[in-house]
């Protein structure tokens, strides 16, 4: 949703407006290289606010390449609601299996790009921060390497 990034990736793209995708939540999942990237996952009673773009066929091909379509992301038809309440049938990229099963934190630069996009388009960042918080909770907990040493020192483990 970052206007600067879209201008670079898709020179013909135009903002059509802010929209809400009901029945999905924002998530960060591993992109195959160990870094988290954004996707939407079905989840009742949730929503994702975002930006709807008008893109040319040329821009769609460029965006397909950037998004790793059809391997990393697939295209799914979704219904979004505009600020005026109008329902629109559109296409969204959604991460494919097995990638979407593995939570991963985004890089600082990637996250800043998303937050900048929110600011540029008047979208609240609360859902982005919630997705980060959920991702942190979904990650496997790392074992404390000092825990065993402390138990041994206290005579709890032999």
Residue ranges, per PLM feature:
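Glycine-aromatic micro-motifs
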Residues: 1-158
């Amino acid at each position: 949703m970052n206007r600067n990034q879209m201008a670079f990736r898709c020179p013909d793209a135009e903002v059509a407006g802010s929209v809400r995708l009901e029945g999905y939540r924002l998530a960060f999942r591993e992109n195959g290289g160990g870094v988290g990237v954004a996707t939407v996952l079905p989840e009742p009673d949730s929503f994702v606010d975002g930006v709807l773009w008008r893109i040319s066929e040329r821009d769609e091909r460029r965006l397909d390449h950037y998004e790793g379509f059809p391997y990393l992301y697939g295209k799914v038809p979704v219904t979004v609601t505009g600020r005026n309440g109008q329902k629109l049938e559109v296409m969204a990229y959604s991460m494919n299996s097995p990638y979407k099963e593995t939570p991963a934190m985004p890089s600082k630069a990637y996250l800043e790009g998303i937050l900048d996009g929110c600011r540029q388009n008047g979208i609240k960042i609360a859902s982005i921060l919630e997705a980060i918080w959920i991702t942190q909770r979904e990650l496997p907990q790392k074992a404390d390497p000092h825990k065993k040493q402390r138990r041994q020192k206290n005579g709890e483990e032999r």
